[in-house]
Amino acid sequence: MKIGIIGAMEQEVAILKDKIEGLSTVTKAGCTFYTGTLNGADVVLLQSGIGKVAAAVGTTLLIAEHNVDVVLNTGSAGGFDSSLNLGDVVISTEVRHHDADVTAFGYEMGQMAQQPAAFIADEKLITTAEQALTEMSDKHAVRGLICTGDVFVCTPERQEFIRTHFPSVIAVEMEASAIAQTCHQFNTPFVVVRAISDVADKESPMSFDEFLPLAAQSSSEMVLNMVTLLK
């Protein structure tokens, strides 16, 4: 099995990149692909860039040119579930766009035309993620709906919009739905596993930039454990 791993930013892939053996690097269309073995598994690690378009371009190349069998999306996310704290982990059961609106044509809020309302994560990969979490006894995890938009959600108004239209949302970020939609169109199994860098409605002594390295550590540890189980 060849495992594809996607992170948007350098900070989100650096820990994993440093652990890849036989590393080779290719850059194309603004995306950087790191190929080699990780904990004995064949992997292609993609630094896609931030946002849905960058993520879709990178995921397309990852599947079509690098021929990965499964896709794991790692990195940071903003928590919406009240039980989440900084450094906790979210695992996708489904992923939706929160910034798409073609409801005028009878679609659900967040549903793109001619696409399903939600992109369903692979059940086997979800199970693998939960098994990987058992090696991280200090981390709390929530599984559920992750919502994506080309918006850094930082205002009460946007938070309320998302809660109103997607009441079961557990976390938000800026790439997962594009990755999920691309995987859906290629019929490639995926799961999103991210660490919480900030939580809606909770005060934190640390800023997003300050906590990002810690979130990257948590999400990278999860991915390393998953890769070991999948190889």
UniProtKB/Swiss-Prot annotation:
It holds the Pfam family PNP_UDP_1. The keyword ATP-binding does not apply. It comes from the Bacteria. One of its GO terms (biological process) is L-methionine salvage from methylthioadenosine. The keyword Amino-acid biosynthesis applies. It is an enzyme of class 3 (hydrolase). Catalyzes the irreversible cleavage of the glycosidic bond in both 5'-methylthioadenosine (MTA) and S-adenosylhomocysteine (SAH/AdoHcy) to adenine and the corresponding thioribose, 5'-methylthioribose and S-ribosylhomocysteine, respectively. Also cleaves 5'-deoxyadenosine, a toxic by-product of radical S-adenosylmethionine (SAM) enzymes, into 5-deoxyribose and adenine. This is 5'-methylthioadenosine/S-adenosylhomocysteine nucleosidase.
